[in-house]
From Swiss-Prot:
Keywords: Membrane, Transmembrane, Transmembrane helix. This is Transmembrane protein 78. It comes from the Eukaryota. It is found in: Membrane. The chain crosses the membrane at residues 49-68, 78-100. The gene is TMEM78. It comes from Homo sapiens (Human). GO terms for cellular component: membrane. Its main location: membrane. It is a multi-pass membrane protein. PANTHER family: PRIMATE-EXPANDED PROTEIN FAMILY (PTHR12138), PROTEIN-SERINE_THREONINE PHOSPHATASE (PTHR12138:SF154).
């Protein structure tokens, strides 16, 4: 399936949990757990994923992702001494990143009370003239 992350300008093709950037042909794949709503040339897909029981309830995508990226400025500054690590650490700080992810990405997972992650995404067929509808 094609995911149009409009704010980043990236088109991603996902098949069985593996996502790679794509720019050519359109292929739509979805499984029985997906709910697809079609309107003219856009699709709204809602998918549920079960979380493993061993994960703590407070662990969410934005927390783990920002924790991972908080080590990025240090590792880059070790390999690139001339790189402006202050600017990079400011832009990738954990306090800035979760709010950026919530506002900037079209693909936004969130932790539900029943232990499922709901992913709302907007699919836009390449070459269509109408603007894509936004996921709510």
């Amino acid at each position: 399936m094609w995911l149009d992350t409009r704010n980043l300008g990236i088109v991603i093709s996902c098949w069985k949990g593996v996502c790679v950037p794509q720019t050519t042909t359109l292929e739509m794949f979805y499984n029985d757990n997906d709910r697809v709503e079609e309107s003219s040339n856009s699709y709204q897909i809602r998918r549920e994923f079960l979380l493993p029981a061993c994960l703590p309830a407070f662990l969410s995508f934005s927390t783990s992702f920002s924790f991972f990226l908080s080590f990025l400025p240090l590792s880059l500054s070790l390999f690139l001494p001339f790189f402006p690590s202050f600017f990079l650490s400011l832009s990738l700080s954990p306090s800035f990143l979760p709010s950026f992810l919530r506002q900037g990405l079209a693909l936004s997972p969130r932790l539900e009370c029943d232990g499922a992650i709901m992913i709302h995404c907007s699919l836009n067929i390449p070459g269509s003239s109408d603007p894509p509808t936004s996921a709510s």
